[in-house]
């Protein structure tokens, strides 16, 4: 007996790990948030630039996040001309290529902002995605620390434009040269120690995640993720001695951080005080340069009302020696924006968001293409992370914007209904014709309109058509009727308001009145 042919298996619909779909509500919230960021960046004189998602892999270079070799940490493929191309892992490396390629045509300093998706070929985990959004601003061709100070001020202004009050965020600033100077003092200067220096930087960069004793393991022989030997993955450390590790931990100590002033301005230390404390951690030219640059930044911040002083206890930007940033290409001042808000997620669990943006000076990135010094500094906001925070604190809505006005259909002749839709659209009203099964009942079409979050629906049966009128059903008010069932008089009154008729030539005006009454506006 012949075997029965097997049914072909259905393809399983599934999303790759570390990626996420987004719906209308989230997209609308992103759009609102991005517009506010854009307004601040443009107020500072930055202009938009777009670069492709793909770059030649060698243009991205060795500056890959948490990796020491090209092609690791990025998604790459070989083109038909046998050249390797990769999805961008941030928006800074592509900008460096863009500026280098168009160097003679661009004004210097070149000031631009960019917004888009970036991609990381890393192990995904909770809150760690392989694709996420960033919004960057960069100044290329400005050699002084004034450009870095401006980035910090702009970061503070952006947080406040997004509805985060002073005291609920802080912009933290440091200088890579300060830590480099400390590393030189313990014998880790020179190119031959570049790998160990980077391991130290990445260990200190995890200070917000791990306790000091865990950081010390990363500075020493290494750390097991499981908490004890043999458990979990092993991260090799920088192999520093205990004395060397102690000096590094002391130089990046939170006790140096400016601020902690009383309401009357007493107590606390200023940013300038912090710089002077840092000068005492080592005695070499590298550390001196770093502290001199931080002093310039501190003076500018104080002059503009952003710094930590006794006259300005409401601190917006502080010098914090624990900030190092994990990317290798930073060469000078580095900065980070941290949210100080404690909130709860949808399940009532406490959430502390921490860093939502950062950046720094990268004087060597454009220079790779030019063979000459090209100073640059930039700031990047993690849009996805910041959006999650703003949604939880109520500064961004998590509801979709109103859907279109739905024109329902009766019978096979749809030309008249399509004309209604066209009339509404010409008046600037979002509208659509119900294009589902033409045999669907009015009730089924209303269910569709509800799912579309429509503010109202247009109904015209054969009787209304003969009279030249339409019925307008207020779906927002209709949804509220259930809460009025105990108050019969009010219920009947609102029920009458929830559906009314008008002449066809009055339809647009009546819909506009309803939308205004319900506060419906499409962004």
From Swiss-Prot:
Alphabetical list of CDD domains matching this protein: HisRS-like_core
GO biological process: histidyl-tRNA aminoacylation
GO molecular function: ATP binding; histidine-tRNA ligase activity
EC number: 6.1.1.21
Localisation per UniProt entry: Cytoplasm
Keywords carried by this UniProt record: Aminoacyl-tRNA synthetase, ATP-binding, Cytoplasm, Ligase, Nucleotide-binding, Protein biosynthesis
GO CC terms in record: cytoplasm
Keyword Nucleotide-binding set for record: yes
Catalytic activity: tRNA(His) + L-histidine + ATP = L-histidyl-tRNA(His) + AMP + diphosphate + H(+)
Pfam families recorded: HGTP_anticodon, tRNA-synt_His
Acyltransferase as UniProt keyword: no
Listed NCBIfam families: hisS
Family per similarity comment: Belongs to the class-II aminoacyl-tRNA synthetase family.
Subunit comment: Homodimer.
Stated name of the protein: Histidine--tRNA ligase
């Amino acid at each position: 007996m012949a075997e029965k042919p097997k049914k072909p298996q259905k393809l399983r619909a599934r999303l790759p790990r570390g990626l996420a779909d987004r719906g209308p509500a989230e997209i609308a919230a992103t759009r609102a948030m991005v517009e506010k960021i854009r307004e601040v960046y443009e107020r500072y004189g930055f202009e938009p630039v777009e670069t492709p998602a793909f770059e030649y892999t060698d243009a991205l270079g060795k500056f890959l996040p948490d990796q020491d070799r090209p092609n690791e940490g990025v998604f790459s493929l070989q083109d038909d001309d046998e050249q390797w191309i990769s999805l961008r892992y941030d928006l800074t490396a592509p900008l460096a290529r863009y500026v280098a390629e168009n160097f003679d045509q661009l004004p210097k300093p070149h000031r631009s902002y960019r917004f888009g998706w970036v991609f990381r070929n890393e192990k995904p985990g909770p809150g760690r995605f392989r694709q996420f959004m960033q919004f960057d601003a960069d100044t290329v061709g400005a050699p002084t620390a004034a450009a870095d100070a401006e980035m910090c001020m702009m970061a503070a202004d952006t947080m406040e434009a997004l509805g985060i009050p002073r005291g609920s965020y802080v912009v933290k600033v440091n200088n890579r040269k300060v830590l480099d100077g400390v590393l030189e003092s313990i014998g880790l200067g020179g190119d031959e120690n570049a790998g160990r220096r980077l391991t130290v930087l990445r260990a200190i960069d995890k200070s917000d995640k791990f306790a000091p004793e865990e950081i010390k393991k990363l500075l020493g022989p290494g750390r097991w993720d499981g908490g004890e030997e043999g458990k979990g993955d092993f991260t090799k450390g920088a192999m520093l001695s205990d004395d060397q590790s102690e000096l590094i931990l002391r130089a990046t100590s939170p006790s140096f951080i400016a601020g902690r002033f009383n309401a009357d301005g007493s107590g606390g230390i200023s940013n300038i005080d912090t710089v002077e404390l840092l000068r005492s951690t080592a005695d070499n030219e590298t550390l001196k340069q770093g502290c001199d640059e931080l002093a310039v930044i501190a003076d500018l911040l104080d002059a503009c009302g952003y710094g930590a002083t006794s006259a300005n206890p409401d601190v917006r930007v502080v010098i914090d020696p624990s900030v190092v940033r994990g990317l290798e290409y930073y060469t000078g001042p580095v900065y980070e924006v941290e949210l100080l808000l404690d909130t709860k997620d949808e399940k009532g669990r406490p959430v502390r968001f921490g860093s939502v943006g950062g950046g720094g000076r990268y004087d060597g990135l454009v220079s790779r293409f030019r063979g000459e010094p090209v100073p640059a500094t930039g700031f990047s906001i993690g849009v996805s992370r910041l959006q999650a925070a703003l949604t939880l604190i109520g500064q961004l809505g998590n509801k979709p914007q109103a859907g279109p006005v739905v024109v329902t259909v009766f019978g096979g002749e749809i030309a008249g209904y399509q004309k209604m839709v066209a009339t509404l659209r010409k008046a600037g009203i979002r509208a659509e014709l119900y294009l589902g099964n033409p045999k669907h009942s009015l009730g089924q079409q209303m269910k569709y309109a509800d799912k579309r979050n429509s503010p109202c629906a247009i109904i015209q049966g054969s009787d209304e058509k003969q009279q030249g009128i339409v019925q307008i059903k207020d779906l927002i008010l209709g949804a509220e009727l259930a809460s009025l069932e105990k108050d019969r008089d009010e219920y009947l009154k609102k029920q009458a308001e929830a559906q009314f008729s008008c002449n066809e030539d009055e339809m647009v005006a009546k819909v506009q009145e309803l939308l205004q009454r319900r506060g419906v506006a499409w962004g």
